[in-house]
Each structure stands twice: as structure tokens, then as C-alpha cells.
């Protein structure tokens, strides 16, 4: 019976499965002529969960993990080009979080999946940092960026490597469980390379010393972090964070690595009978494609650290066409940002194609990659943006090639002129 009449004449509803009345349970859910209580629902869930095999298809159990194609599609919205790097990153990150799902359900005798940290190599301004930031936004996981140049060995002035984990905890409001599945991006990893190929007899506290300190953190260790960001002192309770499941992405420009690669790939003999080879001038992109672990070790990374970053993604130098795309296409493109700024003054911004190419050429000459685009456009518009708030009848600002190349003032189209035209 799902319902009975009480002494007062009111109908009392009962669970069709366990027979408890609506007053004995928190919730009673009605179906067609039947009812089920919250306790029976919980019991059914437990039975289903227990009977689900450990090797069940991941697609059935995952709810919030995007596929590699979905991850790459999000990256495409913010980062122009760099297709191989985006594909490598998407697959590596997807496999990492798939591994975590597997670990939660795996039996003792099951295959153990190990972590694959990532190393991004590419010239300055090619999109390494932007890729990592967009990745974290896509996955909705705790994310922190650390600068390797500020790190020193424990006991010296500077940041300890454990400060990175402290920042990760801060980013997720000190939820240890969430932090243990986050992403850490360590920028400028090439700046902590040791100063010579041979181990030094003097102490290198910001180079090889930091690499040694990063080893266990990247591989997986229990890091002791002071609660709420305080300083370490004796008799203090520490938060214990297991870094085994934290994905580490390291990035760097590795300026000079191309010479190490060329010396290895274009080695020629000496003496009268040796074959004389002419040195080919190769681009950074071509050189970085041939990078091997031995090149990174020769550059100054210690072998143990190179071994802990098995996934290496190289980013290409940006071409003129790619820089023009970066100016206009991404969701947060520089041109869109300046158009928005001028629209707040009631003014339209038109940047002609010849001007876009001129900006790209100038950025290439500066060798600053995509970072140089904003400063070039800002420089061209600074005087106009200074005068615009006081001008009441400007309808449009037009930037052409001469504005960029010859530093001429942009063309101002006034409302009266616009109406006549």
C-alpha cells in the first residue's frame, strides 16, 4: 500500500519499497501510483556502484572530462597556430585525468598508469603561457603559474619550491583534495639550467640546486605546507599535500638550444679526408622539431629532471600571417580590445589590412613574438586616445600602413563628414 487514511482523515503516504511513512523519511518521491523514499534511493545507488566492474567504460562514468578534440577546440579559440603542440597537450592532459579516474576504481592487481609531465619548448611570445592558462580554464581545475627564476634552494633568500604548492592551495581555498588534482605551470624553466656541462664544485643555489629540489615535487612526494600561508616554524601543524597526481607543465624559450641541436645533427669530421659540410641556416622551428633529451641535458637541465618530463611539445616561430591572425581572430584579440576601448567613447576603430601586416612585420623585427603586437598598436593610438575624450564629433578612427611605418597620426573621420559621404 502506498497510502493509508489516518485517524484525522488525512492521507499518509508510504514508501512502496520499505513501507516507511512520509513522516519517517526526509523525502518521498512520487511515481505513477508508487512512492520511493530517499533511503531506498541511496541503497539502490550503493548496489549499482558495487556491481559496476572496475574496467567499466570511462565514457559512462566520466561527467566533466572533455575529450582531446574538445580540449583542442577550446585552445583554438585563444591560441592561433601551434597545431602539433595543441594536439600533444590535449592528449597528454586527457590521459592524465583518465589515469586519475582509473586509479580511483582500479583493483590491486590492475595495471598502474604513471604520470606524464609536459615540457613546452618555444621562442618567446609563441603562446606557451597562454596554452597553459587556457588549458586550466577548460578543465576547471586548480591552476597556478610559478616563475622558476624566483626559486632558490631551501634556506636561501628567495622562494622554496614548496611555495608553488602553497599557491596552488590558495587558488582552491585550501581544499587539499582539489589541489592534489590540479595543474602547475612552471615558466622560464630554461633559466635554472646549470652554468656548465660538468657538475660544479661551488654551490649553484638558483640553478642546479633548484632543479634538484623540483625533482621529488614533480615526480610525487608529500609536501608540507604551512596553513593559510604562514611561515614555517617548529611545533606547527602542516597541511600534507600529495603531489603524485598534480600535472606539472614546464615551459621555456631555451635560447641557444638550437645551436646544441645543430652541433649534434650537423657533426662533421676533421682532417684532410673528412667530408666538408656547409652549415645550413635553419629556423628555430626546424631545429626544435629535432630536439632530443641529450640536447636538453647539454643545455643545462639535469638528466633526472629531463626524465621526469617525458612529453615534449615544441612551438613554432610565429610567421607574419600568424601574427595578423593573432591580431584579429582570438576571443581576446588585441584589435577587439582596442575596438572595445574606443567604442566606450562612442567611436569606431578601423585598422586596414596593410596596417595589420605592418604591425606583424614590426613585431617580427623586434623578435618578441605575439607580445610585441599590443605595444606597437598602443604606441600608434596613444595620442589619439589622449585627445578622444575631449572631442565630441569623432565618428571613426582609421589606422593605415603609414600610421605604423611612419608614425603618422591615425585618420579621424568626423560625424559631419560621415553624413555627407
Curated annotation (Swiss-Prot):
It comes from the Bacteria. This is ATP-dependent Clp protease ATP-binding subunit ClpX. Component of the ClpX-ClpP complex. Forms a hexameric ring that, in the presence of ATP, binds to fourteen ClpP subunits assembled into a disk-like structure with a central cavity, resembling the structure of eukaryotic proteasomes. It comes from Polaromonas sp. (strain JS666 / ATCC BAA-500). ATP binds at residues 123-130. PROSITE patterns: CLPX_ZB (PS51902). SMART domains: AAA, ClpB_D2-small, zf-C4_ClpX. GO terms for molecular function: ATP binding; ATP hydrolysis activity; ATP-dependent protein folding chaperone; protein dimerization activity; unfolded protein binding; zinc ion binding. Coiled coil: none annotated. InterPro entries: AAA+_ATPase, ATP-dep_Clp_protease_ClpX, ATPase_AAA_core, Clp_ATPase_C, Clp_protease_ATP-bd_su_ClpX, ClpX_bact, P-loop_NTPase, Znf_CppX_C4. Pfam families: AAA_2, ClpB_D2-small, zf-C4_ClpX. ATP-dependent specificity component of the Clp protease. It directs the protease to specific substrates. Can perform chaperone functions in the absence of ClpP.
